[in-house]
Amino acid sequence: MNDAALAPDVSAALERGLQAQSLDAAFAAPLLRYLALLVRWNKTYNLTAVRDPREMVTRHLLDSLAMQPYIASGALADLGTGPGLPGIPLAITRPQLQVTLVESNGKKARFMREALRHLELGNARVAESRAEALAEPAAYDHLTARALDTLAGIIAVGGHLLRPGGSLLAMKGVYPHEEIAALPAGWTVGEVHPLQVPGLEGERHLVVVRKG
C-alpha cells in the first residue's frame, strides 16, 4: 500500500491538521507514506489498537506533532515508541533532530526499521531494547515517552539516558498535579504547555521536566 491507497479524506484531514499546527504542507507526503505502511502492517501484526486511518491521523500523527514546537534539534530518545510514535513523525518534521526509537517488542522494531528504510529517514534509528537496559548513559538532550507510565516511572527506566540539563517531554491529558508532586529529587518541572490537537477533544498537556 502507498499513500495513494488511502482515502482522499485521510489526506485532506492531515493537510488541515498540518496547517492548524503551522507545519509545511510538504510534510504531508512522507507522513502519509508512513501512515499507509502502518495501516498495512497493522492488519497482520496488530501494532496499534487504532484501525481507522482517519482516527490514526488525529490520534497518532497530529497528536505526536503537537509537541514539535517545543523541540527543534539535538538527540531525542523516544521510549516505548511502539510503531514509532511520536518519534517518526517528529523525525520527519524536524530533520535536524536525531531520534532513537526505543522499543523492546520485536515486531514493532521490525516495522520501524522498514518504515525508516521506506522513508529514507536518515536522522532516526531503532534500538530494540527496554529503556532501562539501553547502555547509553547521558547520551540524549531530550527524552519522550508518549505511552509510558507516570513521570516518576519514566524517569526510573530512562532517566539515565538524559544528560544533565536535558529535558523529559511527557505528553499528558489533564494537568498531572499528583505526578509533578511525586517527582524524584534532582528533577524539576520547567514548563507545562497546554496543547491543541486538531480533531481531538479533551485536555492535552506537554510537561517539560529538567534533569538537574
From Swiss-Prot:
Top EC group: transferase
Record field: catalytic activity: guanosine(527) in 16S rRNA + S-adenosyl-L-methionine = N(7)-methylguanosine(527) in 16S rRNA + S-adenosyl-L-homocysteine
UniProt-annotated binding residues for S-adenosyl-L-methionine: 80, 85, 131-132, 146
Keyword annotations of the record: Cytoplasm, Methyltransferase, rRNA processing, S-adenosyl-L-methionine, Transferase
GO MF terms held by the record: rRNA (guanine-N7-)-methyltransferase activity
Domain of life assignment: Bacteria
Predominant localisation class: cytoplasm
Keyword Transferase: yes
Subcellular compartments: Cytoplasm
GO cellular component: cytosol
EC number: 2.1.1.170
Similarity comment text for this entry: Belongs to the methyltransferase superfamily. RNA methyltransferase RsmG family.
HAMAP family: 16SrRNA_methyltr_G
Function: Specifically methylates the N7 position of guanine in position 527 of 16S rRNA.
Protein name: Ribosomal RNA small subunit methyltransferase G
